[in-house]
Design a protein with these regions (language model features):
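Divalent metal-coordination and catalytic microenvironments
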Residues: 3, 40, 49, 66, ...
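Conserved beta-strand hairpin/beta-sheet module of binuclear metal-dependent hydrolase folds
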Residues: 1-52, 139-156
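Short active-site oxyanion
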Residues: 35-37, 60, 85-90, 151-152, ...
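Short amphipathic alpha-helix with an adjacent loop that forms part of the alpha/beta core around
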Residues: 50-53, 121-124, 165-172
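Active-site metal-binding loops of divalent metal-dependent hydrolases
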Residues: 8-9, 36, 43, 67, ...
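Active-site metal-binding motif and surrounding structural segment of the metallo-beta-lactamase
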Residues: 43-91, 175-179
């Protein structure tokens, strides 16, 4: 399983087109899984994916964690959909559908596939489990992608884990192959208003410890910090601090073979 990080910033990332983005700024959240799967479809995703040499016409499925503006952009979704070789599947939580604001004309290019918590999906040569995230009004979703014996957890926007999510991950199976963890607040000061729905500098080390002690992550399992907040650029202390906590700090354009 090969993944490419197309955007690694939290809300606060510049919500502007790729062509206008300063070189040192992180992009809004998006991830490509080789084989035609995209996770989150933020404003810069399509143009940056093309810059990275990704076959954007080969994208068949987009999984949307939630429709906040740093994860979803209708224009970017339609850029992927209208360029795709086949009609695109968009998987999102059932209450997100009205927020997408897709017209009948848009739906000629997109199959909207509403999902529920704990649902299992098979598409694009992989199995996907939908998990409840701890974010916003409780309608954000996380995913476990399984392909060719490899398993990837994607959990951006959420603090810690919801009980159902934790019990699913901690079911005694072998460790996951890799995990992508929310790292919205890796520095002080902590915004306690948002602390209930984003990981912060106090929680982040405990997440690594809990994953390893429970066996969800093995000793050498990559635990990747993504959705990185203040500062909203690749410079600064956040990557160093996250690495010291046991994370691989993600950056835009990072490619990882799991």
């Amino acid at each position: 399983m090969k993944i490419t990080f197309l955007g690694t910033c939290a809300a606060g990332a510049p919500n502007i087109p790729e062509a206008e983005l300063p070189e040192d700024r992180r992009r809004c959240a998006s991830l490509y899984i080789e084989g035609g799967v995209l996770v989150d479809v933020a404003i810069q995703s399509y143009d940056f994916a093309n810059k990275q040499g990704i076959d954007t016409a080969g994208v068949t499925d987009i999984f949307l964690s939630h429709p906040h503006a740093d994860h979803y952009n209708k224009g970017t979704l339609l850029a992927y959909a209208k360029n795709a070789r086949q009609k695109l599947n968009l998987w999102c939580y059932k209450t997100s559908v009205p927020v997408l604001k897709l017209t009948d004309e848009d739906l000629e290019f997109v199959n909207v596939c509403p999902v529920d918590f704990m649902q299992e999906i098979e598409t694009a040569g992989m199995r996907v489990k939908v998990l409840p995230g701890n974010h916003a009004d409780g309608d954000a979703i996380h995913f476990v992608f399984e392909q060719d014996g490899k398993t990837l957890f994607y959990g951006l926007d959420g603090a810690w884990f919801t009980p159902r999510e934790w019990h699913y991950l901690n079911d005694g199976k072998k460790p996951l192959s890799a995990l992508i963890i929310d790292a919205t607040m890796p520095n002080e000061p902590i915004n306690y208003i948002n602390a209930g729905e984003h990981n912060n500098v106090l929680l982040l080390p405990a997440v690594v410890r809990a994953l390893k002690e429970s066996g969800i992550a093995g000793e050498n399992t990559p635990i990747i910090a993504d959705h990185i907040g203040v500062p909203y650029h690749h410079k600064g202390t956040a990557p160093e601090r996250l690495a010291a906590m046991g994370y691989i700090p993600a950056y835009d354009g990072m490619v990882l073979e799991i």
